Every structure is written in C-alpha cells, then in structure tokens.
C-alpha cells in the first residue's frame, strides 16, 4: 500500500502552564483510547506532534484509504471525540489568517531531498 505524509500546523496559547498541560495530555498513557482508535480507523498509520515555543507541527503518515472528510464526519458524530476536541481547544489557537473554525492547517511541502538528488543526479548523467 502506498503511504503519504501530511503536515499540519497549529498554535498553542503562549502560556507555560497551559503548554505543560497540553503536553501531559499527549503522553501515550493520557490520550483517550477513543482518540487513538479514531485515528487508526481513519487509515492514519502514524501521527507525531512536535512543538517549538507555542507552534505545533503535526506529521501524519496515511494510507490510500485515508479520507479526511469522512474522518471529520465520523468525528462530528462521536461525543467522545468532540469532548477531546473541546478539551484540546482550551490550549490551542488558530493560526493568523485561518478560516473561522479552522484548527490544524495543512502545510505544503516545498522541498524534498530525495527529489533534489534524483534531479541533480539525472542532470549530471
């Protein structure tokens, strides 16, 4: 199965205590089982969140069956996922310029080392 990596960005409120709480909620033992199950059922093979200051970067590896609209629709009807989202929104804030209600914003890839190597090796031949 072909896999694809996606990258999303979001900010946290710039408050050390809130950021510490957010990180605690994301310990492997603290993320609600329903959240983990929802991610897996959606075709997400791996999901990692990185933080620099109050900026979050989420990397997702998804299979061909991943459909973000279908996942959003399922999540909208799941009270437990909605409760998790409401809890997380206490810590999160939208990026400047985000649409109303938009949380994680997709980032487009602008460089891939493997592609540069392929192009440069191809032009050297």
Swiss-Prot record:
Top-level division of the source organism's lineage: Bacteria
Gene3D superfamilies: 3.30.70.100
Reactions accelerated catalytically: alpha-L-fucose = beta-L-fucose
Span of the signal peptide: none
UniProt keyword annotation of Isomerase present: yes
Enzyme Commission numbers on file: 5.1.3.29
EC class of the enzyme, as a word: isomerase
GO MF entries: L-fucose mutarotase activity
Regulation of this protein's activity per its record: Active toward L-galactopyranoside and D-arabinopyranoside but no D-fucopyranoside activity detected.
Keywords from the UniProt entry: Isomerase
Active site: 13 (proton donor)
Annotated function: Plays a role in the catabolism of L-fucose. Involved in the anomeric conversion of L-fucose.
Family, as annotated: Belongs to the RbsD / FucU family. FucU mutarotase subfamily.
Protein name as catalogued: L-fucose mutarotase
Native organism: Xanthomonas campestris pv. campestris (strain ATCC 33913 / DSM 3586 / NCPPB 528 / LMG 568 / P 25)
């Amino acid at each position: 199965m072909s896999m694809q990596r996606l990258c999303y960005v979001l900010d946290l409120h710039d408050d050390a205590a809130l950021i510490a709480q957010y990180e605690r909620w994301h310990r492997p033992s603290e993320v609600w089982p329903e959240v983990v199950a929802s991610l897996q059922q959606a075709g997400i093979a791996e999901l990692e969140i990185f933080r620099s200051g109050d900026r979050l970067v989420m990397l997702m590896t998804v299979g061909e069956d991943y459909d973000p609209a279908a996942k959003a629709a399922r999540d909208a009807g799941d009270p437990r996922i909605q409760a998790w989202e409401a809890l997380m929104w206490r810590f999160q804030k939208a990026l400047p310029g985000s649409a109303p209600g938009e949380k994680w914003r997709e980032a487009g890839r602008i460089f891939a080392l493997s592609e540069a190597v392929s192009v440069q090796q191809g032009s050297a031949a």
